[in-house]
Amino acid sequence: MIPAVVLLLLLLVEQAAALGEPQLCYILDAILFLYGIVLTLLYCRLKIQVRKAAIASYEKSDGVYTGLSTRNQETYETLKHEKPPQ
């Protein structure tokens, strides 16, 4: 019971100390704001790079729209029908 009361009092004291220095909160808010902007920019940059890489790899691959080419070897061979001797 006593440790719970002491813990509650410590939490209340910490809240009162945090309210006494609003300038520190403003500084921390500014740091978090800049951190969020930097992370957002890095995320957007990464998405753009991935999209450009996907487009480049799609253009390099043999896609559906590439032209047809002739084959050197025939697919089917002709059968040589020999008559059996009579």
UniProtKB/Swiss-Prot annotation:
Modified residues (Phosphothreonine): T78
Record's subcellular location: Cell membrane
Membrane topology: Single-pass type I membrane protein
Modified residues (Phosphotyrosine): Y65, Y76
Signal peptide location: 1-18
Record GO terms (molecular function): IgE binding; IgE receptor activity; IgG binding; protein homodimerization activity
Keyword terms of this UniProt record: Cell membrane, Disulfide bond, IgE-binding protein, Immunity, Innate immunity, Membrane, Phosphoprotein, Receptor, Signal, Transmembrane, Transmembrane helix
GO terms (BP aspect): antigen processing and presentation of exogenous peptide antigen via MHC class I; antigen processing and presentation of exogenous peptide antigen via MHC class II; cellular response to low-density lipoprotein particle stimulus; defense response to bacterium; Fc receptor mediated stimulatory signaling pathway; Fc-gamma receptor signaling pathway; immunoglobulin mediated immune response; innate immune response
Domain ITAM: 54-82
PROSITE patterns in alphabetical order: ITAM_1
Superkingdom, taxonomy of origin: Eukaryota
Extracellular side of membrane: 19-23
InterPro entries the UniProt entry points to: CD3_zeta/IgE_Fc_rcpt_gamma, FCER1G, Phos_immunorcpt_sig_ITAM
This protein's GO CC annotations: external side of plasma membrane; Fc-epsilon receptor I complex; Fc-gamma receptor III complex
Assembly and interaction partners: IgE Fc receptor is a tetramer of an alpha chain, a beta chain, and two disulfide linked gamma chains. Associates with FCGR1A; forms a functional signaling complex. The signaling subunit of immunoglobulin gamma (IgG) Fc receptor complex. As a homodimer or a heterodimer of CD247 and FCER1G, associates with the ligand binding subunit FCGR3A to form a functional receptor complex. Associates with CLEC6A. Interacts with CLEC4E. Interacts (via ITAM domain) with SYK (via SH2 domains); activates SYK, enabling integrin-mediated activation of neutrophils and macrophages.
Family: Belongs to the CD3Z/FCER1G family.
Protein known as: High affinity immunoglobulin epsilon receptor subunit gamma
Annotated source species: Macaca fascicularis
Taxonomic lineage from the root: Eukaryota, Metazoa, Chordata, Craniata, Vertebrata
Encoding gene (name): FCER1G
